[in-house]
Amino acid sequence: MNELVIFNKIKWLISYSDKYVFNSFTKVHINLKIRYQDRLYFLLENCIRSNTNIGNIRVKYQKEMLIDISLIDYYIGEAYDKKIIKKNRFSSVINSLNEIRKMTYSWSIINEEKK
C-alpha cells in the first residue's frame, strides 16, 4: 500500500494539515475544521478501498475520492475566505489536492480502458 503514489500524497496532506492547518481554526469555526478533517480521512479510506477492490467497486470508490477532493477544496476555500488560514498554507493544500485529483482522474481513466 505504501507504494501507491496517491496514498502517499494523501498521507502527506493529512500530515501537513495536522501541523499547519488544524491549529489555525478557532472555536467559532470548529465545525468547519471537523468537516475538513473528516473528509481528509474519508479520502484516505476511499483510496485504500479502491486500491483493494476491482471492477465496478473500484470505480465507485474512485468517484467517492473525487467527491471527497471537491469537498475538501470547498472547505479549505471557506477557511481561506474567512481568513482562518494564510495564503501560503492555502496554496500548499490546493496544489496537493490538484495533484491528487489529477492522479485519481488518470487512475479511473486507466481502469475504464481496461474494461
Protein language model regions, located:
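Amphipathic alpha-helical assembly/interaction segments
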Residues: 1-115
